[in-house]
Amino acid sequence: MIAFLSAGIALGLYAGFSPGPLLALVISQTIKHGPKEGVKVALAPIMTDFPILLVSTTLLIRLSDYKMILGIVSILGALFLVYLAYGSIKTRGVEVNIDQEGPYSFIKGAIVNALSPSPYVFWITIGAPTIIKGLAESYIAPLLFVGSFLGCLVGSKCLLAVIAGKSKHFLTGRPYFYIMRALGIVLLAFAFVLFKDGLRLLK
């Protein structure tokens, strides 16, 4: 149980703090319209991730008798985590483009997240295999994983919206870089676990 909760927290924090289109939109909406609009953008994954999560998990459950497929998916997930960890350790901050359009923050956030490849790759290669592994132990394990992941993802982006509303320099300062490097190291640890699970399924 603790392992699934820990995985959800670590991956959620990474997804929340890492530079990308959604975080850039959170910051730009905050700068233009205030923290409240940035928080609205941050809430978008609650709506957009659930359909991706359900489809990915349902598909892999139907293929669960084919352990080789799950093994390959898990190894691909581990490689994706290594890629994310590298990007996290080497991060240089967040680039933000400012325009003067109306807020429409939640809608913009939902569109940006739905059109980004990252949620699809994450849930297919990392999220869904973790949920299926959790279901083998208890129905509570996947709920802990998904709940902690989305809670930390949305919560950290909301926190960044509030911080950006008070200090626009945080996302280019040392504390942010240290956070991202620490999260990168944690991701490498989870990549090792996922890779080991993949090899076990291939046997």
What are these regions (language model features)?
Residues 66-93, 150-156, 160, 171-203:
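Selective transmembrane alpha-helices of multi-pass membrane proteins
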Residues 108-126:
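Selected transmembrane alpha-helices and immediately adjacent juxtamembrane segments
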Residues 8, 12, 105, 109, ...:
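Helical-face signature of the major facilitator-like transporter fold
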Residues 3, 104-105, 117:
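Juxtamembrane cytosolic amphipathic helices that cap and anchor the N-termini
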Residues 22-26, 85, 123-127, 147, ...:
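Hydrophobic/aromatic residues in alpha-helical transmembrane segments
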Residues 2-71, 125-144:
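Juxtamembrane transmembrane-helix termini in multi-pass membrane transport proteins
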Residues 9, 13, 17, 50, ...:
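Hydrophobic/aromatic residues within the transmembrane alpha-helices of Major Facilitator Superfamily
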Residues 35-108, 163-166:
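Membrane helix-loop-helix hairpins that form the core translocation module of multi-pass transporters
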